Amino acid sequence: YSEINCYQLALTYKPNYANAWTNLGVEGGGTVDGVKYSEINCYENALKFDAKLALAWYNLGVVGGGTVDGAKYSEINCFENALTYDAKYAMAWYNLGVE
């Protein structure tokens, strides 16, 4: 089994599994129940199910930002949110400084 296949299967059985959505995004996205999801879509879904998931916020920032619960978030907004939920997230601090 590949990592992508495992994440896709996990989401087939538990569609609200935020960590699986995040990991599927890290792998570049995938298909769940016949629907194709991009990296951005995966991170947005992860945050729909767990808005406090710092890794998903960070990764959404890395890919350019996105929309969560109808609100648009820039890269900077995403890194700031990641830091709200994990103040010691070194890479989020670094990327916030780069932006």
Task: Report the location of each language-model feature.
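Structural signature of tandem alpha-helical TPR/SEL1-like repeats
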Residues: 1-9, 30-45, 66-81
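Intrinsic-disorder/low-complexity detector
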Residues: 8, 14-15
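Short, intrinsically disordered, charge-balanced linker/junction segments flanking boundaries
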Residues: 92-99
